[in-house]
Amino acid sequence: MRKSKKILALISAAAMTAGLMACGATSQEAADTQADAAQDVAAEDAAAEDTTAQEEASQDAGADLSGSISMAGSTSMEKLANAVAESFMAKYPGVTVTAEFTGSSAGIEAVTAGSVDIGNSSRALKEEEKAAGVVENVVAIDGIAVVVDPANTVKDLTKDQLIAIYTGETKNWSELGGEDAPIVVIGREAGSGTRGAFEELVGVEDACAYASELDSTGAVIAKVASTPGAIGYASLDAIDDTVTAAALEGVEPTVENIKAGSYFLSRPFVMATKGEISEQNETVQALFDYLASDEGKAVISGVGLITVD
């Protein structure tokens, strides 16, 4: 295409020269016209070659990076992990990224043992985990939504009401201005990052009276959606229209409110490594560079999470 444009430009210049001569222009004016056209063509060729060189360099960089990255951990981070893996492998075809969703604590145990490169955790690391050499790399911020079944008329709860519900002090929705129906308290299993973060933020650690303890985010949402009077909690980015996300202290669970600090149920999404990022292999380092780039942040935002600086 560039060659065709170059030929057309030179033909046009020749035609203009002939026209000028026919109109009585001097041979110097005609020569100047041809020289200007040649300079334009040369500049266009140089710009095109520079663009091609940049594209080839980018492709070469992608082709040069190879290897595998293994992740395990939080079920709440499944959507993020899958999106990052897909986009990163598209950018670097020589890289394979695998992810297992076994729960935050299991992910931290795996990275501590060296059986995976990255342990995904939807809670902050504990001091004993850090003492074992695991480094907390926060890649995004997530909100935790309190969800009720769609027919529930109670749409707003205070922190004190949440405490009373989850400790079993409040047992009927009528006590909160709702229908005369028993409250069915749904939660996650022990070791879940979502459960740990929720209980810590609400102030009900090891004090919850659960009717059901489920092993995944999807299971909690499905149970609440199908159980009259149910209440549960789940990652904000996983909420769908089968449940109602309640406001807390009059504040809706939205990205804007979490960024503003007005919604109190939020937590970090951590991609933990054994040692600092700089100590990891080239492929793992490239993944973290990607997450910090504009392209990586777009992936994070695309799954409903809040990016970090």
Residue ranges and their predicted role:
Residues 1-11:
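Bacterial Sec-dependent N-terminal signal peptides
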Residues 36-44:
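Short extracytoplasmic/periplasmic juxtamembrane "stem" segments immediately C-terminal to an N-terminal membrane anchor
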